[in-house]
Amino acid sequence: MRRPMVAGNWKMHGTRASVAELINGLRHLALPSGVDVAVFPPCLYINQVIDGLKGKSIQVGAQNSAVESMQGALTGEIAPSQLVDAGCSLVLVGHSERRLIMGERDATLNRKFAAAQACGLKPVLCVGETLEQREAGKTLEVVGRQLGSIIEELGVGAFANAVIAYEPVWAIGTGLTATPQQAQDVHAAIRAQLAAENSEVARGVRLLYGGSVKAANAVELFGMPDIDGGLIGGASLNADEFGAICRAAGN
């Protein structure tokens, strides 16, 4: 049975003071024992968060990492090995904001995915379609291509030590949310694509939904058979709301 997971992506939010306040809120949460919980703070605050959450069962990850696994001459980048040294266990790869705003392409993301795994970081691969692509009926084509790029380059076995997050771009920060059935349909297609290559990997990989998840809709979303938790954006900046989402995953 797949263990549920709830991950909070803080994006480019926070100051030392507000992060300290959020850490304090997280420390006081009663989290369900059967759920893996993680947060992805801005890189400047990773050490603060790791230190502040010591003794709490919350993993800390990075929002981005370099295409090379080891430190070297890549100005402005952070190597996966450095993130491991700092205490991170996870890293986001291919978030839609990286794909669409920063122009990251599948070939670059394949390298980031591989470099992370080479250092012992577990990548959380983000896939998803824009509103235009959904309205054109291309959702499964787009998601399948994003997923297939990793499979073709690294093999389906790479997902034995990874997480996949489906995040429809049109539902991120807009207040819009895919219906539970819409999300389930895409998650089922992702699992089927993996199963066509390796059924064991497909059964074991956790698929998270990301896109305006809140405590109010989490129970219904997480009740779908192929949705194993959530990648939470804005709601993760409120400790009480985030805790309620974690408890929904535990149910």
Swiss-Prot record:
* Molecular function per GO: triose-phosphate isomerase activity
| Any matching Pfam family | TIM
- Catalytic activity entry: D-glyceraldehyde 3-phosphate = dihydroxyacetone phosphate
Q: Please give the pathway this protein is involved in.
A: Carbohydrate biosynthesis; gluconeogenesis; Carbohydrate degradation; glycolysis; D-glyceraldehyde 3-phosphate from glycerone phosphate: step 1/1
**Keywords from the UniProt entry:** Cytoplasm, Gluconeogenesis, Glycolysis, Isomerase
Active site residues according to the UniProt entry: 95, 167
Query: Is Cell membrane one of the keywords UniProt gives this record?
Result: no
- Subcellular localization(s) per the UniProt record: Cytoplasm
Broad class of enzyme this protein falls into: isomerase
What does the record list as GO biological process? gluconeogenesis; glyceraldehyde-3-phosphate biosynthetic process; glycerol catabolic process; glycolytic process
One Gene Ontology cellular component term attached to this UniProt record is: cytosol
Predominant cellular place of this UniProt entry's protein: cytoplasm
Q: What is its EC number?
A: 5.3.1.1
The answer to whether keyword Cytoplasm applies is: yes
- Specify which residues bind substrate according to the UniProt entry for this protein: 9-11, 173, 212, 233-234
By its UniProt entry, which Gene3D superfamilies does this protein fall under?
Aldolase class I
Summarize the subunit comment: Homodimer.
The protein's job, in short, is: Involved in the gluconeogenesis. Catalyzes stereospecifically the conversion of dihydroxyacetone phosphate (DHAP) to D-glyceraldehyde-3-phosphate (G3P).
Annotated HAMAP family: TIM_B (MF_00147_B)
Say which family it is in: Belongs to the triosephosphate isomerase family.
Full protein name: Triosephosphate isomerase
Q: Which organism is it from?
A: Pseudomonas fluorescens (strain ATCC BAA-477 / NRRL B-23932 / Pf-5)
Q: What is the lineage of its organism?
A: Bacteria, Pseudomonadati, Pseudomonadota, Gammaproteobacteria, Pseudomonadales
